[in-house]
Amino acid sequence: MAAPTPSNRIEERSGHASCVRADADLPPVAILGRSPITLRHKIFFVAVAVIGALAWTVVAFFRNEPVNAVWIVVAAGCTYIIGFRFYARLIEMKVVRPRDDHATPAEILDDGTDYVPTDRRVVFGHHFAAIAGAGPLVGPVLATQMGYLPSSIWIVVGAVLAGCVQDYLVLWISVRRRGRSLGQMVRDELGATAGVAALVGIPVIITIVIAVLALVVVRALAKSPWGVFSIAMTIPIAIFMGCYLRFLRPGRVSEVSLIGIGLLLLAVVSGDWVAHTSWGAAWFSLSPVTLCWLLISYGFAASVLPVWLLLAPRDYLSTFMKVGTIALLAIGVCAAHPIIEAPAVSKFAGSGNGPVFAGSLFPFLFITIACGALSGFHALICSGTTPKMLEKEGQMRVIGYGGMMTESFVAVIALLTAAILDQHLYFTLNAPSLHTHDSAATAAKYVNGLGLTGSPVTPDHISQAAASVGEQTIVSRTGGAPTLAFGMAEMLHRVVGGVGLKAFWYHFAIMFEALFILTTVDAGTRAARFMISDALGNFGGVLRKLQNPSWRPGAWACRLVVVAAWGSILLLGVTDPLGGINTLFPLFGIANQLLAGIALTVITVVVIKKGRLKWAWIPGIPLLWDLAVTLTASWQKIFSADPSVGYWTQHAHYAAAQHAGETAFGSATNADEINDVVRNTFVQGTLSIVFVVVVVLVVVAGVIVALKTIRGRGIPLAEDDPAPSTLFAPAGLIPTAAERKLQRRLGAPASASVAAPD
């Protein structure tokens, strides 16, 4: 019998559903639902829209009275429901047009290591864990300096119209190209010049991003035996889950999930007990350098081992902790009804001289929030690990669009944890030590002089706040993570345990942050490896073999290159806190958003190439907005005459002090620190220029290719020919009645996937 082709697609309609077959002699590979929207559904969505509009009205226009945090949660939730049901559906029907009778890269290239068809629930867990890192936790906390209103609008609306769209569509074009990386797709679709720029620039950006994320993990876990023990235990638990699903009970995802959740909760609770034992404190209180080497080793192992053994189950397991904690915080908001202490729009939004970060609301609020609304890093995951695990094209909507929507909600909750804090305490936590001298008395004097609303803070108040969470001081605990932990403790102790458990919740939050961010390190390493393989393979010769995923020596070599790159920067940052990775922190947000510009450019061009010019506005509008934000921010960072904003102006001031033989200048307290600032600002300014040049080259190439395509003379679409699928799997996280019926007929575990017999 001849191999079936996509043209053999057969639809058998029954009521509001159709069974799709790739071959008449094989079982169905998909169920297409065509259920109309009933009156009950219409009433529900109208009610959601009305409630959402009311909530946004309260959030935006009630300025002269306190605003309850519940309103922001309600506004966000209603917006997500409408966005996923209607806007994501529009994109699916008009742009993506998924074909579940087409085999995905995981089915075609199934190699048991990188390409593995995986249950959609596990893929969703892996994908969410991989994309949700430091950005949605730290960015909104820092952006609270500008006020809660612009931050909440951008996090929610920006995600629905930009971030979710980017993730969904990058996943789509990668799946249609055998899971190719973003850099390779730039080369294939936009030409060699843009491709070289992307294949060189993107790995540099991703190396910086992974190193920054890893440093946040190291700082959170240093001298924290509870966190180290609990996170270490997730590794054997994940390996057990992977083997359980692979060999013992294939397809029993719900079963292994219950076991994994139980073991995870045991690891979290027992971590507190272990930390208070003599042997636990000795074994798990690790120095930053030791943690670096352990993290580097883990990153390499996670990228080498088969994806089903460690990466996917560990990310899936971590998702339960992530989503569970965020859900608990959301319940805490609804139960405690905390009042938002931050102003709707602060005076720092216009002045641009806030103590947390310098710069005006536009463009730096959008740069600071970063992954909470739009993230270029996500494009690497959507063209890295996720397309190589996906069972069906129909699952892309819930995983790509839904995964980013979930992360946006994480950012909303993170924003609220900072916004409900007394603003004097918020700025005490986030003001640079240059202004506070790490003293409660000096900090109180400084923040009381900022012109904040509310009662002035006293040194005793600051000391009591630190003691309530088991810390010696909370003064100048910059970076956002300590503020998030403090806000989480403030929220959770009101719901569970009272004041007596506030310190417990604070240290739990520290562990949660490390676990939350670590999953992006391992997935990012694997995604970066794919990009390095694609980039080097373009040189031809023996390097061409690197693009073959089955060539293990090449895969291992690329993994070593990636881990060595971010690992060396991580070690530099830990051993040299005034330089190294800290140099790259201000670049994190801009680089991430510039990467999103590259991804949206490729998406827009592909949509035009596929003859869907009418719908090119869907990725095109987010692209124009992202370019306006990032290029403006880059211009200011490169050319601003304000030394608190412009890299080169700051470089010139410190270089002048260096040449004058000064021993202290600005934030530098000695000559060595002055030298560090001179070096760091040079690196920052240079990388800013490089990143902008890369993005401009890609965008210009995209415009040229798009115009040629419209005129009928463009580069051909680099999409692989489809192959027929023999695998059935439900499209959504929850199977429909028709899908369940087919599953029972095929004899597979409830809601699992099943392959046609050979």
From Swiss-Prot:
InterPro entries reported for this sequence: CstA, CstA_N
Keywords, ordered alphabetically: Cell membrane, Membrane, Peptide transport, Protein transport, Transmembrane, Transmembrane helix, Transport
BP GO terms, sorted: cellular response to nutrient levels; cellular response to starvation; peptide transport; protein transport
Annotated localization: Cell membrane
Pfam families reported for this sequence: CstA
GO cellular component, one term: plasma membrane
Membrane topology classification: Multi-pass membrane protein
Primary residence: membrane
Keyword Repeat part of the UniProt annotation: no
TM regions (residue ranges): 42-62, 67-87, 122-142, 153-173, 198-218, 225-245, 256-276, 291-311, 320-340, 361-381, 401-421, 498-518, 561-581, 588-608, 615-635, 687-707
PANTHER family: INNER MEMBRANE PEPTIDE TRANSPORTER, PYRUVATE_PROTON SYMPORTER BTST
Family: Belongs to the peptide transporter carbon starvation (CstA) (TC 2.A.114) family.
Cited function: Involved in peptide utilization.
The protein's name in its UniProt record: Peptide transporter CstA
Organism: Mycobacterium tuberculosis (strain ATCC 25618 / H37Rv)
Gene name as annotated: cstA
